[in-house]
């Protein structure tokens, strides 16, 4: 008489601990991979993905989302993490992304386009759903990668004729500063910026000053067009160069950042140069301290937080498949304070 076969026990569905054991990682690592976290080594991520495929493991749809390249993560590669305006924008960007359920991951490239490409490539390999870049100058290979992966990209602090962007016209903003000085009567106007190689914004701002002066029949003397490093010390050094460069010194300086302008003010005081009596100074960004300098700094105000919020809105819409506007203009504005005045000669003529 044949014995009855025991009832077959249904096969147990694999769980996260099974994936962890097969992949040789912890269950926490499995969770991070399936939730799209970027902070997982590529070799461990690959091991987890292979294990989930081998076991047929699905956890609340996370593996399916991963296979569809949904990571709930946005990357940002910026030139300088010490720049106050970038930090303001990133803070607003992160707040907007957080409301949409996304995490922001950040890298700094130090004004090196090859480093920017490497950092962005790492992010793309680890998994991001969107990317923010600064400026309009980048390696073409970066956009080839994002296009192949259908990753939306937005450029900030600039405008572009072809790419999605959130920002302002750097040339127009700098021209506004130059025109204000020209209206005051200045003709010997210097321009001081940080590095312009692989930094389109510095060159565009200097070009905006030069173009505004040319339209008014003036020009920047070659010795008055300086490229320095970034920071307060660089501003101090710039004024020393301008005052010892031969020929008549400038009566006004347009600086590419407020930090450079701050350095100019410090060095002017050290040299006994009255600002704005003998020298007018204009900065760029309207940093928190600009209104509290002595004298208070005339500057170009950049609405960095608005730029960050608008960038978040653009990326969230693109990642959700919603319609978007390619260009979002957030104009910069001239803020007149106490570091600018008519040149001494113009004041004397007026008194006569």
Where is each model-derived feature located?
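Short hydrophobic/charged patches on amphipathic alpha-helices used for structural packing
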Residues: 63, 117-121, 143, 178, ...
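Conserved beta-strand positions in the central sheet of alpha/beta enzyme cores
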Residues: 29, 75, 132, 190-191, ...
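Short acidic/polar active-site loop segments enriched in Thr and Asp
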Residues: 26, 72, 129, 187-189, ...
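N-terminal helix-turn-helix DNA-binding module of bacterial transcription factors
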Residues: 1-72, 213, 347-351
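Amphipathic helical "hinge" segments at domain boundaries
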Residues: 57-122, 127-130, 195, 207-211
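Short beta->alpha connector loops
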Residues: 57, 110-113, 134-139, 160, ...
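Bacterial carbohydrate/catabolite-sensing allosteric modules
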Residues: 1-10, 54, 95-100, 148-155, ...
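Active-site-adjacent beta->alpha loops and helix N-cap segments on the catalytic face
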Residues: 137-148
